[in-house]
């Protein structure tokens, strides 16, 4: 959903950037047997949860699955603008 909103109202990406991102998602799928849709959904949900606690720059966000031997690691690089004083819905 967030991806759709970004496409309609958001940033312009070059066709090379879009092709590179699609290729990266295909390679991740091949190596980890995870669909590109799964990875995109994971990224959107991470944005939703992390945004409760801090303001982030979604444009610079990078979420990947890396494989080494028989292990898979989720690696997220998320630029943080600032921390929020209290989490939304916090009981404090």
From Swiss-Prot:
SUPFAM superfamilies the UniProt entry points to: Cell division protein MinE topological specificity domain (SSF55229)
Instruction: Tell me which UniProt keywords the record has, alphabetically.
Output: Cell cycle, Cell division
Which BP terms in the Gene Ontology apply to this protein? cell division; regulation of division septum assembly
InterPro entries referenced in this protein's UniProt entry, alphabetically: MinE (IPR005527), MinE_sf (IPR036707)
Superkingdom to which the source organism belongs: Bacteria
Give the family, as the similarity comment puts it: Belongs to the MinE family.
Read off the HAMAP family from this record.
MinE
Its biological function? Answer: Prevents the cell division inhibition by proteins MinC and MinD at internal division sites while permitting inhibition at polar sites. This ensures cell division at the proper site by restricting the formation of a division septum at the midpoint of the long axis of the cell.
Q: Matching NCBIfam families, A to Z?
A: minE (TIGR01215), PRK00296.1 (NF001422)
For this entry, the protein name equals Cell division topological specificity factor
Q: Which organism is it from?
A: Symbiobacterium thermophilum (strain DSM 24528 / JCM 14929 / IAM 14863 / T)
Originating gene: minE
């Amino acid at each position: 959903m967030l991806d759709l909103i970004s496409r309609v109202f958001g940033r312009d990406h070059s066709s090379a950037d879009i092709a590179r991102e699609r290729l990266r998602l295909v390679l991740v799928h091949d190596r980890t047997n995870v669909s590109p849709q799964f990875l995109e959904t994971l990224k959107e949900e991470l944005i939703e949860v992390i945004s409760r606690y801090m303001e982030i720059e979604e444009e610079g966000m990078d979420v990947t699955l890396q494989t080494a031997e028989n292990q898979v690691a989720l690696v997220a690089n998320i630029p943080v603008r600032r921390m929020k004083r209290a989490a939304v819905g916090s009981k404090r």
